[in-house]
Amino acid sequence: MEFLVEDLGLVPYGEAWAYQKRVHREVVAGNRPPTLLLLEHPRVITLGRKATGENLLFPESWYRENGFELYWVERGGDVTYHGPGQLVGYPIFPVGREVRRFLRQIEEAIVRVAAGYGISAYPTPGYAGVWVGEDKLCAIGVAVKEGVSFHGFALNVNTDLNDFTVIVPCGLKGKGVTSLEKLLGRKVPMEEAKARVVAAFAEVFGLRPVEGSVHEA
């Protein structure tokens, strides 16, 4: 079997969210194969199902006035940040009732990507995502509707980590964030990171990647 890979480039969050829903409907209907959307977002704060707003360090209006979009969404988890230099992946895959297994597979794929750079990263029991020590390298939060996933992961490649300081990331006080750039001491080409993520997903899910159609607004 195969999965479709669509590289969308830099896409505003609201536009990408709407496109996810469209792709989700097509996968549910059986009109397209499992699909992995890869993209970056302009600066945006998103709040998931567990969020109450207490982990926002400023009023919602402050974020919008200071160059951040802000969205309340249906993914799992609390509050997180997306921005340029961060590789966001939305795997829109049939998962049925195997949601925990699906989350573990995403984690394993990211662990393999990190290992390819010589980084020992791992899941931490009780916390979503992939970690290096006390710092989160990759956030994970999904939603499942009609047996098909959407939302996904956010891997810090060359992310400006200072932008995380305006929230309590994932609601985890005392935990930090990191990036491939910080860990390696150099910029990582985004196209290289994308290729490694696609290869890791192919290995973990046992699917063959096929380049998808060009995204149109």
From Swiss-Prot:
Positions bearing the site annotation: Lowers pKa of active site Cys: K136
Similarity comment: family membership: Belongs to the LipB family.
NCBIfam families named among the record's database cross-references: lipB, PRK14345.1
Alphabetized UniProt keyword annotations: Acyltransferase, Cytoplasm, Transferase
Pathway(s) served: Protein modification; protein lipoylation via endogenous pathway; protein N(6)-(lipoyl)lysine from octanoyl-[acyl-carrier-protein]: step 1/2
Top-level class of the enzyme under EC nomenclature: transferase
Cytoplasm listed as a keyword: yes
Residue stretches spanning the membrane: none
GO cellular component, one term: cytoplasm
Protein name: Octanoyltransferase
Note: In the reaction, the free carboxyl group of octanoic acid is attached via an amide linkage to the epsilon-amino group of a specific lysine residue of lipoyl domains of lipoate-dependent enzymes.
Function (record text): Catalyzes the transfer of endogenously produced octanoic acid from octanoyl-acyl-carrier-protein onto the lipoyl domains of lipoate-dependent enzymes. Lipoyl-ACP can also act as a substrate although octanoyl-ACP is likely to be the physiological substrate.
Residues reported in the UniProt entry to bind substrate: R75, G76, G77, D78, V79, T80, Y81, H82, A139, I140, G141, G152, F153, A154
UniProt record, GO biological process: protein modification process
Compartments reported by the entry: Cytoplasm
